[in-house]
């Protein structure tokens, strides 16, 4: 099922329960960094519902009291780490609607999520269907279908350009990046700074790459 259809079905269910109240973005490590853009989008643009993020284990062991049938939990893990599978089960048990973002339909995430979004995660990579892109698409659809968001059409149109932009950026930036890396490789400390929608990228760069 496409993300657009998933959100349409979710909205129909929520409309019978009083509407959407809160969206939880749950993951750990690189997956948590990857879904951050969707969180930031909703925190910035949503008017009638709110959004927060949790690490998988925190969500399981310090489950928010607000979590109930009027909530959506977007939970992400490429290969379905045990604590993230448990996070999906925790949200299900509280009556929330779960969207499991994962690497294939064969993972433990796919088996327990009420809805499943399989994102591109290999070579060749489709960046318009990456975990980052899918988290944003979920956010765009929620804003559009629940609040009539006026930037929806432009956001959807932009997806067709993502792969081209990434390919061009790789070609243009790689030589400079390699030169910088060679120059700075012996530095004892690297400070990685970011804000806004780029925070997740900086988190991933700091923890996974440096």
Predicted regions and their residues:
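Active-site phosphate/pyrophosphate-binding segments
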Residues: 1-22, 123-124, 140-209
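Glycine-rich phosphate-binding loops that contact phosphosugars or nucleotide phosphates
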Residues: 19-152, 158, 195
């Amino acid at each position: 099922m496409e993300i657009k259809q998933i959100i349409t079905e979710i909205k129909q269910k929520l409309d019978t329960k009083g509407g959407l109240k809160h969206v939880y973005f749950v993951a750990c490590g690189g997956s948590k960094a990857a879904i951050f853009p969707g969180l930031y989008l909703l925190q910035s643009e949503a008017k009638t519902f709110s959004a927060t993020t949790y690490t998988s284990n925190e969500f399981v062991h310090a489950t928010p009291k607000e979590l109930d049938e009027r909530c959506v939990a977007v939970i992400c893990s490429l290969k379905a780490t045990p604590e993230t599978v448990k996070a999906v089960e925790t949200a299900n048990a509280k009556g929330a609607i779960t969207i499991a973002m994962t690497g294939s339909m064969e993972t433990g995430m796919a088996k327990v999520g009420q809805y499943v979004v399989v994102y591109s995660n290999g070579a060749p990579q489709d960046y318009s269907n990456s975990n980052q892109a899918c988290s944003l698409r979920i956010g765009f659809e929620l804003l559009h279908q629940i609040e009539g968001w006026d930037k929806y059409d432009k956001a959807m149109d932009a997806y067709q350009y993502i792969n081209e932009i990434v390919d061009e950026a790789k070609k243009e930036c790689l030589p400079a990046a390699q030169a910088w890396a060679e120059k700075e490789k012996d530095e004892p400390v690297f400070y990685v700074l970011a804000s806004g929608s780029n925070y997740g990228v900086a988190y991933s760069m700091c923890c996974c790459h440096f």
